[in-house]
From Swiss-Prot:
Organism classification: Bacteria, Pseudomonadati, Pseudomonadota, Betaproteobacteria, Burkholderiales
Assigned protein family: Belongs to the ornithine cyclodeaminase/mu-crystallin family.
GO molecular function, one term: oxidoreductase activity
Keywords (A to Z) from UniProt: NAD, NADP, Oxidoreductase
Signal peptide span: none
EC number: 1.5.1.49
Purpose: Catalyzes the reduction of Delta(1)-pyrroline-2-carboxylate (Pyr2C) to L-proline, using preferentially NADPH over NADH as the electron donor. May be involved in a degradation pathway that converts trans-3-hydroxy-L-proline (t3LHyp) to L-proline.
InterPro entries reported for this sequence: NAD(P)-bd_dom_sf, ODC_Mu_crystall, ODC_N, Pyr2C_reductase-like
UniProt name for this protein: Delta(1)-pyrroline-2-carboxylate reductase 2
Length: 311
C-alpha cells in the first residue's frame, strides 16, 4: 500500500456529510475575517484551456493551520458523453509539513460553500431572519441553496421561479425532502412580501429586473464572467453594493461590471461582519467565490473528521 492510497478520499455524498451547513457557515464567518486581514493567501484562480472548449481551474489557498488546493475541470462537451460537466477535487494539506490529509469532492465543496456564503450574506445584511426568500433558477446551484437556506433559516418560506413552465413545480417536488418549505412561485410577478431574492441561473442577460427597493436584499450568484449579468443594471446602480471577495469581483462580478459601478462604493462582506457597513437602503450582495472559501470547507471537514475520531 502506497502512502497516497492511505489518504482518505471522500465522494460527493461523503463530502456533503462532512460539510454540515450551520458548521460551514460558522467556519466561513471566521475565514472571511482572516482573509480580509491578510492572514490567508488566496491568489486569483489559474485557468488552463482543455480540448473542446473545456478549462482546468486551479485554486490554491493557505492559512496557518491548513492549506487547500481545488483542481476542477469544466468540460461542456461532457453532457453529450453522459459525463458530468464539472469534475475535480479539493485536497487538504498540513500547512507546516505539506502532507496531504484528505481529499474532498470538488463540485460538492463548491456548491455547498457557495450556498453557505449566500446564507452568511443574508444573515449579515438582512438583520432579522428572512420570512420569504425567492430562488430564481432550478439547477444544481438552486438545489444547494434550497438545502442550505432551509437548514439555516428553517422558518423562512422558500419560493422558486424557473425559466420554463412546470420547472419550478418539478424542482420543488424533487427537493422538498431537504427543504420542506419549498413552493413554486405563482405566476411571474414577485410579491411584495419577498424580502430576499437569490439569482441562481446560467443566463447571460437579466432574469431580475425589479427596481431596487428598501427592505429587499438581492443576492447575485449565477453570473461569473465579466460580460454576464443576471440582475438589471438599473437595479444594481440604485442599490448599496456588497461583494464576498473584492479582488475577484473586479474581474468576475458581471452584474456589477456590466452596470459600470463605482468600485469605491462597493463594500466587502468582511466590512459588514466587522460592523463597518450600515445596513440600510436597497441592498445587493454579489458573490464570486474564492479559494479561501474552499479552505473554510476543508476546515469544516477536518473538524467533522476529528469529532468522529474523538467519538
Amino acid at each position: 500500500m502506497t502512502a497516497l492510497s492511505r489518504i482518505p478520499a471522500f465522494d460527493a455524498a461523503e463530502t456533503a456529510a462532512l460539510l454540515d451547513y450551520p458548521a460551514l457557515l460558522a467556519t466561513l464567518t471566521h475565514t472571511v475575517a482572516e482573509y480580509a486581514a491578510g492572514e490567508i493567501v488566496s491568489p486569483e484562480r489559474l485557468v488552463v484551456p482543455l480540448q473542446g472548449g473545456g478549462v482546468m481551474l486551479s485554486m490554491p489557498s493557505s492559512a496557518r493551520d491548513l492549506a487547500s488546493h481545488k483542481l476542477v475541470n469544466v468540460c461542456p462537451g461532457n453532457a453529450a458523453r453522459g459525463l458530468p460537466t464539472i469534475l475535480g477535487q479539493v485536497s487538504a494539506y498540513d500547512a507546516t509539513t505539506g502532507e496531504m490529509r484528505f481529499v474532498l469532492d470538488g463540485p460538492t465543496v463548491t456548491g455547498r460553500r457557495t450556498a453557505a456564503i449566500t446564507a452568511l450574506g443574508i444573515q449579515a445584511l438582512h438583520g432579522a431572519a428572512p420570512r420569504d426568500i425567492l430562488l430564481i433558477g432550478t439547477g444544481k446551484q438552486a438545489a444547494n441553496h434550497a438545502e442550505a437556506l432551509a437548514a439555516i433559516f428553517p422558518d423562512a418560506r422558500l419560493h422558486v421561479r424557473g425559466s420554463r413552465a412546470g420547472s419550478a413545480a418539478a424542482f420543488c417536488a424533487a427537493h422538498r425532502a431537504q427543504a420542506p418549505q419549498l413552493a413554486p412561485l405563482d405566476g411571474d410577478a414577485i410579491p411584495d412580501a419577498i424580502d430576499v431574492v437569490v439569482t441562481l441561473t446560467t443566463s447571460r442577460t437579466p432574469v431580475y429586473r425589479e427596481a431596487a427597493r428598501e427592505g429587499r436584499l438581492v443576492v447575485g450568484v449565477g453570473a461569473f464572467t465579466a460580460d454576464a449579468a443576471e440582475i438589471d443594471a438599473d437595479t444594481v446602480r440604485h442599490s448599496r453594493l456588497v461583494v464576498d471577495d473584492p479582488a475577484g469581483a473586479r474581474h468576475e462580478a458581471g452584474d456589477l461590471i456590466v452596470a459600470q459601478v463605482d468600485w469605491q462604493r462597493v463594500a466587502s462582506l468582511a466590512d459588514v461582519l466587522r460592523g463597518a457597513f450600515e445596513r440600510s437602503g436597497p441592498l445587493l450582495f454579489k458573490t464570486v467565490g474564492c479559494a479561501a472559501w474552499d479552505l473554510a470547507a476543508c476546515r469544516t471537514a477536518r473538524d467533522a473528521l476529528d469529532a468522529r475520531r474523538g467519538g
